[in-house]
Design a protein with these regions (language model features):
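Basic, glycine-/proline-tolerant helical and adjacent loop/strand elements
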Residues: 2-173, 178-182
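Long, contiguous all-alpha helical interaction modules
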Residues: 1-5, 11-12, 174-462
Length: 462
């Protein structure tokens, strides 16, 4: 029953203060918003909590009518001498007449699942707890069922207190009109700390002072989330993080290649970063990285393309070391190729052929960049790299280079020995048929974006 005395006391206070409440508390009555007023049950210095039962009673008046989805989805189950109430909880599933597909019509009770009042209340408290985390930007929830703890992090958090979860759950939540659980998955042996340190390297020897924005992240990265930040910023120009769960039609990215890549690969990237699922990530990275590098270059973002190749080759070294495959690292390969081609280009002796296919395709990238540099066009579009990057037949590739030579030879000095050496070694070398397309494209891009050996000043011996 309602305590009439307390009810009238509250009613009287409302009538007396409602139109001057802004004088009691800081509030803007001009706003079109709801105003909630709460009355304390306990007195200021009350020690024996006389009204404790009243507090619980009023709390229950509000909670229990709202704990279930609808009254029509509540049933009473008789157990011996008493009845238990079960219903479809308000949180977790929203069932109404517009969603008849949620009904399970093959059984007597069509309601998808039922909870008793205690469990429904517990679920309500859990969802409210999750909502408070979502409101504060803590979107990544890790539930450790072995150590009985919950950890919540934003995408930017360093996670210094987070080590591993041997068994548990992962939730990705978002605040919408209600709490949205965007992803739920079981987690087994998840570690944010990488098994091996990830070394983000600079293969182009970029000048740190001239390009601080592009070199600031060079170095060791210990955690998946740290590497995930590199993926988001370098590969996806910061568009991935905000579009993991956006409907494809709602992704506001004008670049069609970037948008398509986000839609195709965001799930496997998300799983690797936040769930520790390694399956397919290496293969996916190998595919999308090359597409994004080419796309950046075609759109005249050369520095971005260089950092993307840096990150891709850093991943290549990481996975090679992780699988203990051995062999040379990409930094060694890049340096050897650069120095070998430079030595051949600057030589005044007889022309020497490239040692292997990697050197050959690097040289192709170098000569393509040189031809484009000779263009008299006011705006030199990097899309000209398409003339050589998308050719699979070597004979056609050489014919295309000869066409470029005929187009720009008016600007080439007859005594340009470096050009002659570079062009001669390309025309005189026949690559192996088994060279894979990925390696070919990577080396052409590397040669194209690297400092050009025709223009590089010759080092003089002391």
């Amino acid at each position: 029953p309602v305590n009439i005395e307390i009810l009238e006391k509250c009613r009287s206070w409302i009538k007396q203060h409602i139109f001057s409440i802004d004088k009691l508390v800081q509030i803007d009555l001009g706003k079109k918003d709801y105003l909630k007023i709460f009355f304390e049950v306990f007195e200021v210095n009350e020690e024996d909590n006389k009204n404790r039962e009243l507090f619980i009673q009023e709390d229950n008046r509000y909670i229990y009518p709202n704990i279930y989805n609808k009254s029509e989805y509540i049933i009473n189950v008789k157990k011996k001498v008493y009845e238990d109430t079960y219903g479809l909880p308000y949180y977790g599933i929203n069932m109404n007449r517009k969603k008849p597909f949620l009904k399970i019509k093959t059984r007597k009770t069509f309601i998808p699942y039922l909870l008793d009042m205690d469990k429904a209340l517990l679920q309500k408290q859990f969802f409210e707890y999750l909502m408070s985390l979502a409101v504060n930007g803590k979107n990544n929830i890790y539930i450790d069922i072995k150590n009985y703890r919950i950890r919540a992090y934003s995408d930017q958090d360093e996670r210094k207190d987070f080590s591993e979860i041997s068994s548990g759950y992962y939730l990705r939540i978002q605040k919408g009109k209600e709490l949205e659980i965007q992803v739920q998955d079981n987690i087994v042996d998840y570690q944010n700390k990488l098994l091996l340190n990830f070394y983000y390297q600079d293969f182009f020897k970029m000048n740190v002072e001239n390009y601080p924005e592009y070199t600031k992240d060079i170095g060791i990265h210990l955690k998946r989330t740290s590497v995930g930040r590199l993926i988001n910023e370098i590969f996806f120009s910061k568009y991935l993080l905000t579009n993991y769960f956006t409907d494809a039609s709602d992704i506001s990215v004008k670049d069609s290649v970037l948008k398509r890549t986000i839609v195709m690969y965001r799930n496997v990237i998300f799983d690797w970063i936040y769930k520790g699922i390694d399956n397919n990530f290496e293969l996916a990275e190998r595919r999308f990285s090359l597409d994004l590098i080419k796309n950046a270059l075609i759109n005249n973002y050369t520095l971005r393309a260089m950092t993307q190749l840096n990150l891709h080759w850093s991943f290549k070294d990481y996975f090679t070391e992780l699988k203990q495959q051995g062999g040379e690292k990409m930094a060694e390969i890049a340096t050897e190729i650069r120095e070998s081609i430079k030595e051949r280009v600057t030589s005044k002796e007889e022309v020497k052929m490239p040692i292997n296919d990697k050197e050959y395709y690097y040289a192709v990238g170098q000569i393509a960049a040189y031809f484009i540099s000779l263009s008299k066009a006011g705006k030199k579009s990097q899309s000209m790299i398409n003339l050589v990057i998308n050719i699979s037949d070597d004979r056609v590739l050489k014919e295309r280079l000869i066409q470029l030579y005929k187009k720009y030879n008016y600007a080439i000095d007859h005594y340009n020995v470096r050009f002659k050496n570079l062009f001669a070694m390309i025309l005189g070398y026949k690559p192996a048929a088994q060279t894979d397309r990925q390696t070919k494209d990577e080396m052409i891009l590397f040669g194209y974006m690297d400092s050009n050996s025709i223009y590089t000043k010759k080092e003089e011996n002391n």
